[in-house]
């Protein structure tokens, strides 16, 4: 048995064939970075994403010959609105890091007691309806929805529970879209995808040779959580990618609300299948690897991300230099959208190595913040952490 796995991340997408032995073969990758036309804005062209998904998938399939099924994992909450009749997006997709809806989140809290973050789908969908030219025949989706739509030649308009639960539009008690949240955001439920289990055949990838069945949809962080073997209460992983996500498996008991909790974390669906829904808790760092990219591409203090370790190891401490990794604001626990990256404690004796080490330590300190917040909100003790990226 072999599965074509399509992974659409924030900075690139890949397709590979995974054998039943766990071996990963025929990896195909394309960089696919979002654009930032102004500070705080993060967007991408969904049609270019469609083309790239089809290219890497076809290349991996050609190398493998055939596969038994297709699985999709994706950056979550990034939002696409398109015309149902034509399949053409109504405008740029809004990336999960986009901050243009900060004021809408503040208003939702003050007027409706809804604790939303701009990195969720809810206010992005509302903003698109107000700002993009469209007719009544439009639909929304996150990246998993879009990829399934593309692979099925438009037959599927679906999302899974793990993606739905981080949109800000999902009711964890009814396991359906929240009519109250949709009404507040001005989104018609007919525009939303059907919510399906993370595991189970949902349709055919008819755009690919052989039309293999699509048998899994799962958000990238939840896929990582399960892949790291975190399937008992308290088991935790942290992923350092473009951003940083700490996820803790909590079990089968649904949270009372999908809103942000007191410590700044969010309830998530870890995964769902025919036997039910399993839950987790997530803490969010809005920028992690982005800070390393900044050191490399913009400040030119290092040659590559890998080079950061070599440079930072040239000194034993930061010599008092402190870095706050807030290039896109601060997430858990404070959720300060106006915060910005800050470098403190610089003296005439500060070297390149001190700054690079301070940036790496700043990311690590934010990781510690997320551990504390997750323990406080989940009531679980995190005894160990599994790390990927």
Please give the residue ranges for each predicted region.
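Glycine-rich beta-strand-to-loop/alpha-helix junction loops that act as flexible
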Residues: 73-78, 198-200, 240-243, 384-389
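Short beta-strand-loop/turn "lid" adjacent to the catalytic site in phosphate-handling enzymes
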Residues: 61-95, 117-119, 148-171, 196-197, ...
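N-terminal glycine/serine-rich phosphate-binding loop of ATP-dependent small-molecule kinases
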Residues: 1-91, 137, 194, 210-216, ...
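Short loop/turn motifs at secondary-structure junctions
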Residues: 66, 188-191, 364, 381
